[in-house]
Amino acid sequence: MKGAKSKGAAKADAKLAVKSKGAEKPAAKGKKGKAGKDPNKPKRAPSAFFVFMGEFREEFKQKNPKNKSVAAVGKAAGERWKSLSESEKAPYVAKANKLKGEYNKAIAAYNKGESAAAAAPKKAAAKEVEEEDEEESDKSKSEINDDDDDEGSDEDEDDDE
């Protein structure tokens, strides 16, 4: 009885077969992925805490040159930020608000340019398609195919040289 399986092993195999079938179905559908990030899009403005973190990092590195842990820097900065009063946080908040205003202007310009840039290529592409359609409609299908064949034969002649 070397090849015989127990009932438990047979059930486990059946469950695996069901799971593998279920796993194959979503892959077959082909999910739509996220659109890639635009490298030209302005970076978001930092909050007051992150403005503070930029300065605190430099101080922390000077005081603790051997400590390279990002977690230690973050923890120390968080504790220090909590201990600051509102008046001590005010310069960081003001700087963050200034950066946020600059970001809002930059993102508005980006969005304005993006919408104009997106509309222009669509119109140009539509005109090109219309022009091609007009040229092709004057010719019969056989003439269009002959033109395509002629273009391909030119490439073959270049290879011989």
Curated annotation (Swiss-Prot):
What is an example of a GO molecular function annotated in this UniProt entry? Answer: DNA binding
What protein name is recorded for this chain?
Answer: HMG1/2-like protein
Keywords, sorted A to Z: DNA-binding, Nucleus
Question: Which InterPro entries does the UniProt record give?
Answer: HMG_box_dom (IPR009071), HMG_box_dom_sf (IPR036910), HMGB_plant (IPR031061)
Q: Does the keyword Transport apply?
A: no
Give a Gene Ontology cellular component term annotated to this protein.
nucleus
Q: Where is this region: Disordered?
A: 1-46, 60-91, 113-161
Q: What is its main location?
A: nucleus
Native organism = Triticum aestivum (Wheat)
